[in-house]
C-alpha cells in the first residue's frame, strides 16, 4: 500500500486550464527535473506555466526563452523569488528563497570545439548543475588547434569526472578524439555552427554517428539540454554507487 501511494504521488500531474499538464514530480521519479521549453509559447502562457511550477516545486527551469518571455516571468514572479537569467542562451532558472540544489557528488567534464559552440554547452552546464553535479569546463579546444585540448583534458581526467559532454559544430571531430582517450562515457553534441555543404549541423551529426571510438553517444543537433541531463544521470548514479559502496562489508 505504501509503495502504491508513493507511486501515485510521484506520478502527480498539475493541469493549467487547457494549457499544460505539468509533471511536477518528474525529478523525484526519474532524477531529471521537468524543463519548460519557451519556444512556441506566448509570454503570458509561459509565465503562467513557469510560476505554477515554481509554486509546486520551489524551482522552475526554462529553456529557449526570448526576452519577451523573460520579461513576462520577471513581471509576474513573486518579489522574493530568485531569478537567474542567461539571456545569451535563453535559459532561465527561478527559485524560491528556501530552495537549494542538493549536491550529489557527481562530476561532469564539458568541452567545446569552438567559441560559437559555447551557448549549447552552457545549456548542458546549467541543466547538470541544477541536477546537483559539479561541472568542469574548457571551451574553444577543438581540433583546429589540437594542442589546446590536452592540458584541459588532463585536468578533467584528474578531477575524476564520471562523464564528459563534448560540443562541436562544422566537421564535428572533437568528440571522437576525446572518446578515444578517456575511460568514461562521452556525450557528443553536434551544433548548427557551420555553412556550405553539410551546414546547420548535418556534417557534425553524421561524423559523430560514424565515429569509431567506442563509449560515445550522440544527441540531436543543438541538444545541450538533453546532453546535460544524460551526463548528470550517469554522474549521479556513479556518485550514489560510490556512496553506497562505503557501507558494504
PLM ranges: what are they?
Residues 1-76, 82:
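Long amphipathic alpha-helical segments
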Residues 44-46, 117-122, 146-147, 168-178, ...:
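Short glycine/serine/threonine-rich phosphate/pyrophosphate-binding segments
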Residues 82-86, 178-202:
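Short, acidic/small-residue loops that bind anionic groups at enzyme active sites
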Residues 91-93, 97, 136-157, 201-203, ...:
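Glycine-rich oxoanion-binding loops at beta->alpha junctions
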Residues 103-148:
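Glycine-rich phosphate/diphosphate-binding loop of Rossmann-like nucleotide-binding domains
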Residues 112-116, 154-156, 163, 193, ...:
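C-terminal binding/interaction regions
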Residues 152-191:
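Glycine-rich phosphate-binding loop
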